[in-house]
Regions:
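A conserved catalytic-core segment of Leloir-type glycosyltransferases
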Residues: 2-9, 37-117, 287-307
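Nucleotide-activated donor-binding/catalytic signature segment of Leloir-type glycosyltransferases, i.e.
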Residues: 137, 267-317
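Carbohydrate-associated surface elements
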Residues: 178, 196
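Conserved donor-binding/catalytic core segment of Leloir-type glycosyltransferases
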Residues: 218-236, 242-245, 258-260
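Short alpha-helical donor nucleotide-sugar binding micro-motif in glycosyltransferases
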Residues: 320-326
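Aromatic "clamp/platform" in nucleotide-sugar-dependent glycosyltransferases that forms part
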Residues: 334
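Short hydrophobic beta-strand element within catalytic cores of glycosyltransferases
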Residues: 347-355
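Conserved acidic donor-binding segment of nucleotide-sugar-dependent glycosyltransferases
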Residues: 369-376, 385-390
Length: 429
């Protein structure tokens, strides 16, 4: 019989988490979706993460089945800028204290109740922590009551990982075939369990929100509004994006780019290149409590710009509205371990340009436009090919939504249960 959520207890270890303070990219979104989906499936789920210093240390959600353990709050009070400010101090506290709490407060009570615990740890910050958990479990005589799993979302921090020790005490997983092949080069063979998106993202984007944003931008055929949401990182191919806008404008298409990044320094280089290409760069901010109305007003104020640098935090529902309002979404990374933004944009029914590395969900000209090069002309050429063929664009958008549904968290949880059932039965780790 395949493992069921009701028969297991899950403990998820991750630096990022669902708090705004703890969200720095796709990892926080992944963990929020994963843990909520596990709890909704009936599993008692504990999440240990670096949480907001202003929120409760322990919080119950989903009818008490999801328990949030906000860690290192006393340190976070000195670092108000987010989860990675004061990173090493927080990491030291995480490594030194979480394993003991996990064993005493989660594994031991579960074992006494006859339930098996699955410890799911994410990325390099938790590699040493998981090894310590294994040692403490052995010392407590509880090692066989827990299955340890370490998941790699990307190669960041791989140089810090003791692969021999980690591979000995835990089962390794990753999020795409690209990452599996990458890790082969390190002598590891992880099991692939795909990422997921909240099922709520599959709800149709409100037509009034799409209309408000497009009206604010003065959007309309034949001049496209393109959207790119990513960290300001060279791997995300921001330069390719602004160069594609310049190429389209050079061919007579008045393309514009809404750029939503983070606080990374690569931003300055990208915007300077845009200016050198003759593009007008503007800035928009939807406010501390963004809404459709405030976002529309901010975009309207910058509508004359060719590149609009959208600053500040946007909740998921506004990002989905932005994807739905766009004529195209550029998820054109050169190195993408999975590509969560591309999948989220697909859920909104967007016309998505993806890269060709870890985006296992993307199928060329079936549900996305898959870019094989770093040539901005490839984006421009695809755009020109689609003009006069609204049937192709409509087919891609419909197929994109269907694909996104296959990666909703409830569907991914089913895959996860099958994989964990095998790992627990075969490896004994």
């Amino acid at each position: 019989m395949v493992l069921s959520a009701e028969r297991a207890v899950f403990a998820v270890l991750c630096f990022e988490g669902p708090d705004r303070y703890s969200l720095a990219g796709g990892l926080g979104s992944r963990i929020a979706g994963l843990t909520e989906a596990l709890a909704e499936a009936g599993a008692q789920t504990h999440l240990y993460f670096i949480g907001s210093p202003d929120a409760p240390g322990v919080e119950e959600r989903v009818g008490g089945r999801l328990i949030l353990h906000r860690w290192a709050q006393w340190i976070s009070r000195y670092y108000p800028q987010g989860v990675y400010q004061g990173e090493l101090e927080k990491l030291y506290d995480f490594n030194e204290t979480v394993p003991w709490h996990l064993v005493d407060q989660v594994v031991r009570p579960a074992a006494d109740a006859g339930r098996h615990v699955f410890v799911l740890a994410e990325d390099w910050h938790t590699a040493d922590l998981l090894c310590r958990c294994s040692d403490i479990l052995h010392g407590a005589g509880l090692r066989r009551q827990a299955t340890l799993v370490w998941n790699a979302n990307n190669p960041m921090g791989f140089e810090r990982v003791n692969w021999g020790r980690l591979g000995y005490v835990s089962n390794l997983t990753t999020v795409s075939r690209y990452m599996k092949h990458y890790m082969w080069g390190l002598g590891q063979n992880p099991t692939v369990i795909p990422n997921g998106i909240p099922a709520a993202l599959l709800a149709p984007v409100p037509a009034e929100a799409v209309a408000a944003l497009r009206t604010a931008l003065g959007a309309g055929a034949p001049d496209p509004v393109l959207v790119k949401v990513a960290r300001w990182d060279p791997d995300k191919r921001w330069l390719m994006a602004v160069q594609a806008v310049a190429a389209l404008r050079g061919s007579g298409v008045r393309a514009r780019l809404i750029a939503k990044g983070g606080i990374e320094p690569h931003q300055a280089e990208v915007l300077e290149v845009a200016r050198r290409l003759g593009l007008r760069v503007g800035e928009a901010h939807a406010g501390e409590r963004p809404s459709t109305q405030s976002l529309a007003a901010a975009l309207a104020g910058a509508r004359e710009a060719d590149v609009i640098n959208l600053r500040g935090f946007l909740p998921a529902e506004l990002l989905q509205a932005l994807y739905g309002a766009a004529d195209g979404v550029l998820a054109n990374s050169g190195l993408e371990p999975f590509g969560l933004v591309g999948l989220e944009a697909m859920a909104a029914g967007a016309l998505v340009f993806t890269g060709a590395t870890g985006e296992d969900y993307a199928r060329p000209l079936q549900n996305a436009l898959v870019l094989e090069t770093d040539d901005p002309g490839e984006i421009a050429r695809y755009w020109h090919q689609l003009q006069g063929r609204p049937d192709i664009a409509a087919r891609l958008r419909a197929a994109a939504r269907a694909t996104a549904a296959e990666y909703a968290w409830p569907a991914v949880i089913e895959v996860l249960m099958h994989r964990l059932d095998y790992l627990a039965a075969q490896t004994g780790r």
